[in-house]
């Protein structure tokens, strides 16, 4: 592992050279290597084994989402890919990694000022880890998503390469900036959209961004997520994905109490000035929420908070387990896994949620709390249309470079990546090969369902496809 602390004392040109020197022990072409299939083990066994701490009654929802396509399988199989990546050689350069860096964990969300921001938006698996792991998972997800959208294998591989190239070029730009400028930099999605070559697709994207910028970010979710029943604010039930804790779903009466207790305890982890804001609201209702693909089965609840004048605030409490990267990258320094997620998000995002905090329940389980965002801004589904997926690939690659540069050494990484396309081609080769592995793993999941080994739930149509964001 490279001694990053010692390197920080060196000027940028020396750090670039140190990165270049790493190619001797970790050639860039070696990033094309795939995990050995002999002795790899059954990926379905690994998924089942690592699901023992999840809510077992929700696992059929998880399997139903993962079985939809090889792409959705990859989204839910972060633990499988982490094991595979852990067996491959690395450069030794570590960053605060996303840990689950597939393309649906990027998107547009509203900043506190209401401006649309494109960034990473899921951090359940974040941990200090080799920078290549995030790049490779993103590239593999692009290959599978492109194929799922009807692109040829060669075109899908080109999209993965485009994302890696954007990562390399953006990292080189960041390496030339002073630390303060690099830290506060953000990806200008509007400027990048202007680079879309297809005129119709470019105009469509610019119109969508203009609409997002005009969308209010405050209580806009209220009519969709809640209503007033006899004057009482209440979260809408949308079974089987959002529902209240009742005698049938919570016979012990503990789930609702747990959620309310966690919202109370979480306040103490907020910055003191943020507590003044939270204290203006009172908790009016809580409901259970099934989330994402990879997170299905973890405890997650929505809290509807109301101020004295009826203005709403939606907070979400979500269970945090150890990162899937931990067995291969090392454990988190934080005792509470919720704190691990919060610190990772604050590190990786340019503009983080001001309501981020964490808590633990009496059973020693860990959780983090965040504001429930307006999904119309957060969803990446519209960017995944076939005529814009190449633009989205470039956008994700550049965004990931910015995120990694905040905790990693941009000059060191840029020195390792260099100015040629050697790294880009190697990761594109890896992505194409790993997409085939994921497709084979997906076939094993389908067989396990067909054999009755795994039971799948009957989901609403909107819960099955690639447009469901955030794991």
Predicted features along the sequence, with ranges:
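Conserved ATP-binding subdomain of kinase catalytic cores across diverse folds
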Residues: 8-98, 103-214, 262-458, 469-471
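Long, low-complexity segments enriched in small/aliphatic residues
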Residues: 187-261
């Amino acid at each position: 592992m490279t001694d990053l602390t010692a390197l920080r004392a060196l000027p940028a040109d020396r750090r670039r050279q140190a990165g270049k020197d790493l190619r001797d022990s970790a050639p860039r072409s070696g990033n094309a290597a795939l995990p050995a299939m002999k002795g790899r083990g059954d990926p379905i066994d690994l998924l089942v084994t690592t699901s023992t701490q999840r809510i077992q009654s929700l696992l059929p929802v998880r399997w139903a989402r993962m079985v939809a396509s090889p792409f959705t399988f990859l989204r839910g199989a972060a633990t499988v890919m982490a094991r595979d990546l852990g067996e491959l050689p690395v450069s030794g350069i570590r960053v605060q990694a996303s840990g689950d860096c597939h393309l649906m964990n990027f998107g547009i969300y509203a900043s506190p000022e209401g401006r649309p921001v494109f960034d990473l938006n899921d951090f359940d698996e974040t941990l200090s880890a080799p920078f290549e792991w995030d790049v490779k998972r993103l590239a593999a997800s692009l290959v599978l998503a492109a194929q799922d959208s009807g692109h040829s294998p060669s075109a899908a591989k080109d999209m993965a390469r485009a994302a890696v190239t954007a990562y390399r070029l953006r990292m080189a730009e960041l390496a030339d900036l002073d630390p303060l400028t690099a830290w506060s930099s953000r990806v200008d999605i509007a400027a990048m959209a202007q680079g879309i070559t297809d005129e119709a697709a470019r105009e469509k994207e610019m119109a969508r961004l203009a609409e997002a910028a005009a969308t209010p970010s405050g209580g806009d979710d209220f009519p969709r997520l809640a209503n007033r029943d006899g004057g009482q604010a209440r979260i809408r039930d949308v079974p089987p994905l959002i529902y209240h804790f009742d005698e049938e779903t919570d016979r012990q009466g503990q789930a609702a109490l747990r959620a309310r207790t966690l919202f109370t305890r979480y306040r103490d982890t907020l910055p003191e000035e943020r507590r003044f804001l939270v204290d203006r609201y009172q908790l009016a209702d809580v409901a259970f929420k099934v989330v994402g693909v990879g997170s299905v089965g973890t405890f997650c609840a929505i809290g509807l908070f109301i101020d004295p004048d009826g203005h709403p605030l939606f907070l979400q409490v979500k269970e945090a387990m150890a990162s899937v990267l931990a067995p291969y990258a090392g454990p988190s320094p934080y005792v509470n896994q919720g704190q691990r997620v919060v610190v990772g998000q604050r590190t990786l995002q340019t503009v983080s949620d001001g309501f981020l905090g964490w808590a633990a329940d009496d059973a020693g389980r860990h959780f983090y709390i965040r504001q429930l965002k307006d999904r119309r801004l957060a969803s990446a589904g519209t960017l995944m249309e076939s005529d814009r997926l190449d633009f989205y690939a470039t956008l994700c690659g550049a965004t990931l470079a910015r995120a990694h540069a905040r905790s990693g050494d941009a000059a060191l990484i840029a020195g390792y990546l260099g100015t040629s396309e050697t790294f880009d081609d190697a990761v594109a080769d890896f992505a194409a090969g790993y997409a085939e592995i994921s497709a084979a793993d997906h076939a094993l999941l389908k067989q396990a369902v067909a054999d009755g080994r795994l039971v799948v739930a009957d989901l609403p149509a909107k819960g099955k496809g690639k447009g469901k964001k955030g794991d």
